[in-house]
């Protein structure tokens, strides 16, 4: 049976762990699946995260164990260190494009369709905003037998040009305009998105280098310092 957020919504740590696995599978495929240490670093990174979290290793491990019970993540046995990968598309029953949008919403919070298209550049290249909106509409109109809607369109905040979308994987969201009153204009969002992409690209390069060093250490049988 598909994942149903209405009866068993994700916790905040579960959503962060799952979304981080989704992100890294697309942005740093050479270092994926992730070790627990790499996953912890990805969950707690400061760029491309809203809110920024400071999860502990035990909290990440607990989230992994809980997600594994729901078949949303899989543990891959390694030579020395266990690695983890998501099973999101099959577990939730959505295509890759929808998985990318949901992952971004879990990592960065509510976003407009335009912001999602910009932020998804390294996840999936959508042809235009209309294609993003088409997948969002599909997620919003998801039937009950498939687990119900997975996103909702929030009311447009005062001063904002466009309404924002939010995911429902953690249950219903507070759609009050007060919560979203700080929404920035589209031009500012594009600038912030471009900067965040550059920072994310650098962090992904560092993560890939760390993963390479870790695998070399595993092959040589030496401890990583």
UniProtKB/Swiss-Prot annotation:
TM region(s), chain numbering: none
Superkingdom: Bacteria
InterPro entries linked to this entry: DUF480, WH-like_DNA-bd_sf, WH_DNA-bd_sf
Pfam families: DUF480
Family affiliation: Belongs to the UPF0502 family.
Database matches in HAMAP family: UPF0502
Protein name, as recorded: UPF0502 protein Dtpsy_2730
Organism: Acidovorax ebreus (strain TPSY) (Diaphorobacter sp. (strain TPSY))
Origin organism lineage: Bacteria, Pseudomonadati, Pseudomonadota, Betaproteobacteria, Burkholderiales
């Amino acid at each position: 049976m598909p994942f149903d957020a209405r009866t068993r919504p994700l916790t905040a740590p579960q959503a962060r762990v799952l979304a981080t696995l989704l992100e890294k599978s697309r942005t740093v495929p050479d270092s994926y699946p992730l070790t627990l240490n790499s996953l912890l670093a990805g969950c707690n990174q400061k760029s491309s995260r809203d809110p920024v979290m400071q999860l502990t290793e035990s909290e990440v491990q607990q989230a992994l164990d809980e997600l594994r019970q729901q078949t949303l993540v899989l543990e891959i046995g390694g030579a020395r260190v266990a690695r983890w990968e998501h099973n999101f598309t099959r577990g939730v029953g959505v295509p890759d494009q929808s998985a990318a949008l949901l992952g971004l919403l879990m990592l960065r919070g509510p976003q407009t369709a335009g912001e999602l298209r910009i932020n998804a550049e390294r996840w999936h290249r959508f042809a235009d905003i209309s294609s993003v909106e088409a997948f969002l509409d599909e997620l919003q109109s998801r039937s009950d037998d498939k687990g119900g809607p997975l996103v909702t369109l929030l009311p447009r905040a005062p001063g904002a040009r466009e309404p924002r979308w939010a995911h429902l994987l953690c249950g219903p969201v507070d759609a009050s305009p007060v919560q979203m009153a700080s929404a920035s204009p589209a031009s500012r969002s594009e600038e912030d998105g471009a900067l965040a992409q550059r920072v994310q690209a650098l962090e992904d390069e560092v993560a890939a280098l760390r993963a390479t060093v870790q695998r070399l250490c595993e092959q040589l049988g030496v401890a990583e310092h």
